Amino acid sequence: NVSDFFNLFPDTVLTIVDSHPIDVAASHTKVAILKHAVTMGEQLILFSEQTQFILSSSADNLTPLTANVLVATEFESSDDAPPVGSGSSIYFLTKKGDFAGIREYITQTDVTLKDASNITIHVPRLIPSGIFKLAVSNNQDILVCLGTDNPNKLFINRWLFGTQGQKVLNSWFTFTINPNRRIKNVDFIGTDLFLVIEEDTHVTLEKLPFESDYKEDNATFEYHLDHKVTEASNNVTVAFNTTTKKTIFTVPYRLRGEMNVVGRYIASNETSTFVDLNGTTQTLKAGTIIKTTNQTDGTTSTIEANGDYRNAKVIIGEPFEMHYRFSKQRITESPQQSSAEIISSRLQLHHFYIKFEQTGFFKVEVTP
């Protein structure tokens, strides 16, 4: 009842009043068991496994007498992952045998015809089955898929709308972490994706920023490291052994691979120095990689380096690799964006030029 949320029964059965609970069925020729509901503007979209419905009202007010559940579209969906809304679209999961797909359900108030385009049509075998969570960032136009078949991998979709509301970019990529770690859940808060990650003995909460041109404080470039901490972070200690002449950095997590200790950018009123093995005090320049001397095998949380770095300003993290595969090259009939591809001839690439500026090391692999 109105203002009585836990009272699910009408006060009288002789008449229907506006304050009674709304109890309306979704009538259809198919079996329609409603699984999920997503609000979109002034509409409530209801999902069954084969049909989408809209909860609407025949009057200005939504009451037991005016409520209607109308059939909107007929698309198969999976109830393994709840649909998520972004802008005027709803993204929901579909099953395709051993693989999964994502459809974008478009709702527009000025258009009565609704549609759900397949945004994985160009990557039909990318996403495996077992997806159980969808997360979306409205600020960054990003959709993240998490499944049980690859618990250490995220499948991420990024889109961009051009003029007149036309989607000009629909790209997919993956984000993979250490195979000994399992992602249990993800969700966005603002532009940051928070991940619950399970290991053999403990669970951690980690953050993956999707902010454009993200940089550390005072830095002119981004450090491409995972699990970044500084010497000033909580639970990070820097100690010096006077016998071995080594600095011991202790971080608040177990080290799973090779770690980098890098001099970080500092404010104008700060200094960053270290003492080498000869006893000479030197300035640690930003971007300088400090050579470490111990191996990290997943059982320790310490990093050792020759010299005294107790007065150094550093950033500590795990380096990672990024792989990019170019899309299939094609020749079109005209330079227009929607022009058809010429398929009556054979395409042979003689040269392929890559323009780059102010980048780090990268390697290009060409497969004949």
Report each predicted region and the residues it spans.
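Catalytic or ion-translocation cores adjacent to nucleophile or general acid/base/metal-coordination motifs
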Residues: A59-I102
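Short beta-strand elements that form the blades of beta-propeller/WD-repeat-like
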Residues: N1, K35-S48, F53-I54, A81-K95, ...
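Sequence/structural signature of beta-propeller blade repeats across diverse families
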Residues: D18, S57-T73, E104-T120
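Beta-sheet repeat architectures centered on beta-propellers
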Residues: T29-A32, D98-P368
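Beta-propeller domains
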Residues: N1-P21, L55-P64
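Short, surface-exposed beta-strand-loop junctions and turns on beta-sheet-rich folds
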Residues: F53-I54, A59-L62, P151, T201-H202
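Short coil-to-beta transitions that initiate beta-strands within beta-rich domains
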Residues: D18-T39, V71-G87, V123-A135, N178-K184
